[in-house]
């Protein structure tokens, strides 16, 4: 089997050396180029024919997202992953065509060198077989009135949502989620989301989605009420997120927990909890992602009466999680990404 041809672009000589030395030990990966200057790197793509490019976000002369917007149209078969310090700009690179990203050492708590290299190698391998997609422009919605300062949790400051939309995604999901929720009007039932992502980045991602959507979007906290017009995104880290219910309605319950289906937070944990308390009042959506997280939970949601939707293979960056859910019989309908928002909204037509 041919080796994955990898190009590394980072203005730090120390980090380039660290990365090429360690990633190059994997027998399935061949380092074909290492550059500190993205402009120089772009001139050599045609000759070196990399399968995957691992690049920094903040570099002299050209940012990572600018590099991708320049290179991807000319070399559409090349895949990219971003290795970035803590910055919301990483999501600009995702929109420009990057398959995935990894937080640089020091950008996320508890750096483990061995775990970091293992994660990068895994993401390089996934990226090499992923599908690339071009997404539509993400224009912010008209400005909303500033939200009131949150009260002690749980809060009941808005209309409690009688229905719940639960969404799970992994590789390629940051853009896929936006492609769905940007079509939701401000009065859409409450949405809860698990997107596999490093700690801290989820807050920046929620802020980005909030600028684009008509709904209010934020990183979830323990006890947040699931309210009409609000999207809650599970924080990355060591807490699992569950949906709970009391006399006032649905709320999020976050608690430290072991990985489930290989992840924390886990889509399976969220979906399974939704099946127990929302059942027929919920819609479950599983989007692009590697592995099987969410397949069991979505199947349980369907068994309990929820309507379930899986993204189809053609529109997925990685057709893993939706495929496993489909194989288990957990998908009511399988749809292209562009049709999922309307399918969700049809289920709640006339009821919130």
Annotate each PLM feature.
Residues 2-4, 13-24, 28, 34, ...:
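Conserved acid/base catalytic micro-environments in cytosolic active-site loops
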Residues 10:
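Conserved acidic carboxylate
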């Amino acid at each position: 089997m041919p080796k994955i041809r990898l190009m590394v672009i980072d203005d730090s000589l120390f980090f380039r050396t660290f990365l090429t030395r360690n990633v190059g030990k994997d027998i399935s990966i061949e380092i074909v180029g290492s550059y500190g200057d993205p402009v120089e790197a772009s001139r050599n793509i045609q000759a070196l024919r990399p399968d995957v490019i691992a690049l920094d976000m903040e570099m002299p002369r050209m940012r990572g997202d600018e590099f991708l917007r320049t290179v991807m149209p000319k070399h559409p078969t090349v895949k990219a992953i971003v290795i970035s310090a803590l910055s919301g700009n990483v999501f600009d690179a995702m929109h420009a065509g990057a398959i995935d990203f990894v937080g640089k050492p020091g950008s996320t708590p508890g750096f483990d060198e061995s775990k970091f290299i293992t994660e990068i190698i895994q993401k390089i391998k996934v990226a090499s077989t992923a599908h690339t997609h071009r997404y539509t422009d993400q224009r912010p919605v008209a400005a909303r009135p500033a939200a009131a300062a949150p009260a002690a949790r749980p809060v009941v400051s808005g209309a409690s949502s009688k229905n719940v939309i639960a969404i799970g995604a992994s590789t390629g999901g940051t853009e896929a989620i936006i492609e769905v929720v940007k079509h939701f009007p401000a009065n859409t039932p409450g949405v809860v989301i698990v997107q596999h992502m490093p700690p801290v980045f989820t807050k920046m991602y929620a802020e980005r989605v909030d600028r684009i959507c008509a709904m209010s979007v934020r990183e979830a906290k323990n006890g947040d009420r699931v309210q009409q017009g609000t999207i809650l995104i599970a924080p990355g880290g060591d807490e699992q997120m569950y949906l709970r219910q009391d006399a006032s309605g649905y709320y999020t319950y976050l608690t430290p927990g072991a990985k489930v289906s290989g992840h924390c937070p886990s889509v399976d944990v969220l979906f399974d909890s939704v099946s127990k308390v929302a059942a027929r009042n919920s819609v479950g959506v599983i989007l692009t992602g590697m592995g099987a997280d969410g397949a069991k939970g979505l199947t349980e949601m369907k068994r309990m009466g929820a309507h379930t939707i899986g993204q189809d293979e053609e529109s997925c960056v990685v057709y893993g999680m939706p495929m496993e859910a489909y194989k288990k019989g957990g998908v009511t309908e399988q749809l292209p990404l562009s049709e999922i928002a309307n399918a969700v909204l049809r289920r709640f037509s006339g009821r919130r």
